[in-house]
Amino acid sequence: MKRFMQIWKPAVIGFLLLTLVCGVLYPGVVTVFAGVAFHDKANGSIIEEKLADGTTGKVGSAEIGQTFTEPEYLIGRAASDGVATNLNPTSEEQKQLVEKRIAWWHKLDPTNNRVIPMDLVTASASGVDPDISEAAAAYQVDRISRERGISTKEVKEIIAEHTSNRLLGFWGEPTVNVLQVNLALDRLKM
């Protein structure tokens, strides 16, 4: 029995110590730090708006894309809808999905004869991207302006207000947050 305790006692103590450090202390410190330093992001970047009935309600997250299909809204990337998004770029299935999405865009705005930006006809890896490229937003300006009866200048200004720049001025591409633009467009009615 003494030999058994000599072998297992350090293992059990090590297990309990690592469980305490890795399972309680570290996650607790990180959670508290995130809540203090990055309060908004740590809590889901929830956007609250004044609703039609005068109350304030949660309308979405700035970090998770919502589906918009109405022509008066800025429309984001295609949702993956349970379809694998890691298809080979040259596969027949990917080609058919892209062709279907191109047809949808032409049906939505038959007067727009510009080339559809790639991010509007391909799905993201996560399927929930909240942002689109500046080119994808610019592609939709005329339609939104026409549908809402406002100037293209107003639409462009709203898009510019909700465009994030490159990280550190050189990393990545500027992106436009779809939900924030659509909420700003809806605020014009008020």
UniProtKB/Swiss-Prot annotation:
Primary localisation category: membrane
Gene Ontology annotations for the cellular component aspect, listed alphabetically: plasma membrane
Job of this protein: Part of the high-affinity ATP-driven potassium transport (or Kdp) system, which catalyzes the hydrolysis of ATP coupled with the electrogenic transport of potassium into the cytoplasm. This subunit acts as a catalytic chaperone that increases the ATP-binding affinity of the ATP-hydrolyzing subunit KdpB by the formation of a transient KdpB/KdpC/ATP ternary complex.
GO molecular function, one term: ATP binding
Assigned keywords, A-Z: ATP-binding, Cell membrane, Ion transport, Membrane, Nucleotide-binding, Potassium, Potassium transport, Transmembrane, Transmembrane helix, Transport
Subcellular location: Cell membrane
Membrane topology label: Single-pass membrane protein
The family this protein is said to belong to: Belongs to the KdpC family.
Protein name per UniProt: Potassium-transporting ATPase KdpC subunit
NCBIfam families assigned to the protein according to its UniProt record, in alphabetical order: kdpC
TM helices/strands, residue ranges: 13-33
GO biological process: potassium ion transmembrane transport
Quaternary context: The system is composed of three essential subunits: KdpA, KdpB and KdpC.
